[in-house]
Amino acid sequence: MPITPTPSDHPHFPGRGKTGLLLVNLGTPDGTDTPSMRRYLKQFLSDRRVIEVPRLLWWLILNGIILNIRPRKSGDAYARIWLKDDPDGSPLRRITRLQAEHVANSLQSNDLITDYAMRYGKPSIQSQMQKLQNAGCSQILVMPLYPQYAASTTATVNDEVFKWALDLRWQPAIRTAPPWHDHPVYIKALADSVRQSVKKNGMPDDLVISFHGIPKSYFVAGDPYHCQCLKTARLLREELDWDKAHFHATFQSRFGSEPWLQPYTDKSVVALAENGSKHVAIMAPGFVADCLETLDELDIELHEEFLEHGGETFSYIPCLNDSPAGMKVIEQIATENLAGWVDTPKKGTVKKSAAKKAVAKKAPAKKAAAKKA
């Protein structure tokens, strides 16, 4: 029986058999100007996973009030941390790009293509997923860069990935990496960063562990984020053998009038200063890369508040970023979730130039219910 010939209008498919690894972070605006900020905020705040408010009511609030007031204020905040002489502009974009390059270097394989994307802003998840498929990836591991799971972070990344696949005739196999809030490598990396800070800045009177907050109603509805954050904090305190009385897990970045997870970071730090704490060290383990919420909200705004209320020394402990310890965490999680798809070396011995070739995209021209811990 003869084989039916390929139709003349049959689409061309690139060589299959490659594996894609996509690191995904929250996102960043293209610039600090008002139009860029408005575009970014509109996309971010229109996400049903982020804002769980009746759509019509929220549309009126967002378009009638927030997008007419917030862009300029947010732009001013971004301007304070913007990398003006760097083509990436955004610290988050630069660090995420470097993380992808480091992973490509360490896990380099002829069958693995590593890239990065942003849930909001550029490069988008859908464009990067398509790029990986076009490059021959028949299986793709998506790694949301959130150690603790929340519907408003991890779930919305997964939503966007599968939205891309929804209309595909030929879908690749897709895996999504789970959270790693209690992974030993992650906890050790956090503990080591605290130890380094103590060695450099001295022993603080209090150590504050600040996580991004979510509305309390999300937790009540079943989101495991609060439990996972507290477990991370508990494991970190145990690893450090830190005095409970001077170890504080808090939540930052609340938005609007609805109650969020507590205690609030800003109020907690001010209270510490008012009660006689002279030296506070603070870290934000829920962020794998420094960004607006850490560089500005913590290290600038909260730093100033602490000093204004009687504090003397404020030690901000940077995120793990693309440090050797930070990369060890990301590489370990990626390796575990690539099992069966790609054989990866234990150590990367490839030169940086080769790593850059393995990264599908270089820098742009411009510009989170589980058991309680």
Residue ranges of predicted features:
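Active-site-proximal alpha-helix that buttresses catalytic centers in soluble enzyme cores
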Residues: P2-K352
